[in-house]
Amino acid sequence: IRSLNNIGSVFRTADAFLIEKIYLCGITAIPPNKEINKTALGATETVNWKHYKTTLECIDDLKRSGYTICSIEQAERSTMLNDFAVEKDKKYALVFGNEVYGVEQEVINKSDRVIEIPQFGSKHSLNVSVTIGIVCWELVRK
């Protein structure tokens, strides 16, 4: 994620839904950062996080730890979010792409599932922090 405001919003959303940990990858800035703090409102202190040089390295570690990797992207093999069935005995790691390119194809290829938010307008694009809020709410609700 490139926008520092979006990163801060991700921390706030993660705090709201008691997300276990955020994995920041690649060019994504990390706390402490004044611009991140503007939207995080202290959530960088309440949510655990770790930075990885690459998303693929992160995915490999999460898979070794037993996580099901779910990329959130509009892709050929995606399942609509409203049709996605949460299995209570599984641990899920959600992968969100950056604001310009979304989730990289090689990351999608390594994912166990691809989930898409149904959209009806002409843009077929949501801000990444909005996407994270929608997906987290839907999965918690289920």
What are these regions (language model features)?
Residues 1-142:
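Post-transcriptional modification and biogenesis factors for structured RNAs
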